[in-house]
Amino acid sequence: MTNIRKTHPLLKIVNNAFIDLPAPSNISSWWNFGSLLGICLILQILTGLFLAMHYTADTTTAFSSVTHICRDVNYGWIIRYMHANGASMFFICLFMHVGRGLYYGSYTYMETWNIGVILLFATMATAFMGYVLPWGQMSFWGATVITNLLSAIPYIGTNLVEWIWGGFSVDKATLTRFFAFHFIFPFIIAALAMVHLLFLHETGSNNPTGISSDTDKIPFHPYYTIKDILGALLLVLALMTLVLFSPDLLGDPDNYPPANPLNTPPHIKPEWYFLFAYAILRSIPNKLGGVLALVLSILILVLMPFLHTSKQRSMMFRPISQCLFWILVADLLTLTWIGGQPVEHPYIIIGQLASIMYFLLILVLMPMASTIENNLLKW
């Protein structure tokens, strides 16, 4: 008799995705981040669900409901901080996952890659709306500043912003709809993640060499299930260390006073995981130009397959490209630092140089390096 996991309509899908899936024998720990992102998403949905049970999406009570969760609800404080810091872990895993894709040329799986970019946008939108919900000072002003960027769109801009706000400023209507969207989006992300996996399983995983691994496959279970469990344990360890020892480390103290439309915080800035994009936005003096640069800083990922000029897929055997890749990482860290600094000398010029460097590396220098490496192969 055939095993039930191979015949049952539902179990068959699980089996083909997580048990009998043929996987490359040499994928490194950089391939763990996909499963870690899945765990982050499940964790965020669960903690978010329990927070939503006690949260009220109303301007007068939102802030106090979050305070109530932290003070009066059983283990409310740990649920709240797991949710807030879980978002940080989510983005750390996302950046690692995307970086892995760039380094090892995984973007040549076009469908998987493009769904991944959509997932990145969806996650960023969700995190932004979630940051507005506690209705602290930075929540309110962050929402005001970022939504206001849409007014840079010619002709329809102002109407669009007021439509999103549900009024003439960020108010009750805005908070309520942000809560509604923040609740539904993770489920859309989960659905997209399944499509992401569906496309990935059409081709199979890439591996560090970038060479086809069809000749040397091993079953996903037990090899990669146990490896994923180890990754998950390390993720939970890191998250709980953050939550239990320094839960406010990555937060902004400016979000502790309740929202006050009459008082602007000295430095409006988003959570740390948006700072690199925020720095690119601020480095262009023109409003529309800044917004375009902001969107393009992420959307540029879609161009990666077309900018790939190398004869090799992975960067494993391409030292010049490796150097440029790590310069890009350093550049992104510089942008993240600049995004959190006030708009004054020397930060302005550093931010502008780092922004130029970012686009220059991706659009010009890396494709050039690949071409040079192709020619070096002939020697």
From Swiss-Prot:
GO terms for biological process: mitochondrial electron transport, ubiquinol to cytochrome c. Heme b b562 binds at residues 83, 182. Its cofactor is heme b. It holds the Pfam family Cytochrome_B. It is a multi-pass membrane protein. PROSITE patterns: CYTB_CTER, CYTB_NTER. A ubiquinone binds at residue 201. One of its GO terms (molecular function) is ubiquinol-cytochrome-c reductase activity. InterPro entries: Cyt_b/b6_C (IPR005798), Cyt_b/b6_C_sf (IPR036150), Cyt_b/b6_N (IPR005797), Cytb/b6-like_sf (IPR027387), Cytochrome_b (IPR030689), Cytochrome_b_C_euk/bac (IPR048260), Cytochrome_b_N_euk/bac (IPR048259), Di-haem_cyt_TM (IPR016174). Heme b b566 binds at residues 97, 196. The keyword Secreted does not apply. Heme 1 (or BL or b562) is low-potential and absorbs at about 562 nm, and heme 2 (or BH or b566) is high-potential and absorbs at about 566 nm. Component of the ubiquinol-cytochrome c reductase complex (complex III or cytochrome b-c1 complex) that is part of the mitochondrial respiratory chain. The b-c1 complex mediates electron transfer from ubiquinol to cytochrome c. Contributes to the generation of a proton gradient across the mitochondrial membrane that is then used for ATP synthesis. Belongs to the cytochrome b family. This is Cytochrome b. It comes from Cephalophorus rufilatus. The lineage of its organism: Eukaryota, Metazoa, Chordata, Craniata, Vertebrata.
